[in-house]
């Protein structure tokens, strides 16, 4: 009862207020609230480039927030991932994807989710997040290109998708994707080796 009264009357400030995340946060189970705040606090300690202090999470006035809802929750999820709390990190990344933000931000989160699924050795989950990123590509392509000075860098999802197609025995489809990646101008340092391996399997 006392805890409930405290939650009702406590100051609702900080980044949660600035980003309009208080309702989302208060509707979380208590253990998830504690984890979100814990990994936020850990982020303030471990990242010298993080512009906020622990107290800014839920108190005080924070102006000109440098994050969208999506990237803010994503950066907390990344801290959980780095600390090895994979289950919570995955949950929070997926919460972040539900929030407002750009397709490019979603691409970065999906990259992390692919890595997380690899750590879990869950190939079905790897495929799930890879396909989400591949489908999203047309929406984030231009921003990615502009951030890389007019070129397209390596995109992990496409390279893993080639591997998954090959693993499923879909060699022709994998080869078509390899050629498409090259034609699209996406950096693909293993193009020659992968193409040769796939061609050998078609013989």
From Swiss-Prot:
InterPro entries registered for this protein in UniProt: TPR-like_helical_dom_sf
Top-level taxon in the UniProt lineage: Bacteria
Species classification: Bacteria, Pseudomonadati, Aquificota, Aquificia, Aquificales
Identification of the protein by name: Uncharacterized protein aq_460
Species the sequence originates in: Aquifex aeolicus (strain VF5)
């Amino acid at each position: 009862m006392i805890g409930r009264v405290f939650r009702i009357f406590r100051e609702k400030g900080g980044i949660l207020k600035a980003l309009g995340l208080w309702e989302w946060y208060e509707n979380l189970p208590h253990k998830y609230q504690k984890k979100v705040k814990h990994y936020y606090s850990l982020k303030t300690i471990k990242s010298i480039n993080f512009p906020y202090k622990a107290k800014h999470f839920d108190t005080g006035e924070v102006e000109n927030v440098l994050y969208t809802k999506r990237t803010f929750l994503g950066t907390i999820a990344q801290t959980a991932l780095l600390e090895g709390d994979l289950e919570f990190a995955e949950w929070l990344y997926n919460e972040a994807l539900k929030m407002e933000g750009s397709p490019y931000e979603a691409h970065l989160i999906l990259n992390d989710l692919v890595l997380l699924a690899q750590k879990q050795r869950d190939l079905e989950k790897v495929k799930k997040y890879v396909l989400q990123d591949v489908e999203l590509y047309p929406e984030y392509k231009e921003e990615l290109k502009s951030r890389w000075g007019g070129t397209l860098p390596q995109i992990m999802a496409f390279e893993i998708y080639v591997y998954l197609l090959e693993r499923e025995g879909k060699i022709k489809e994998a080869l078509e994707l390899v050629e498409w990646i090259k034609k699209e101008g996406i950096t693909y340092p293993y193009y020659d080796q992968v193409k040769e391996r796939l061609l050998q399997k078609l013989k």
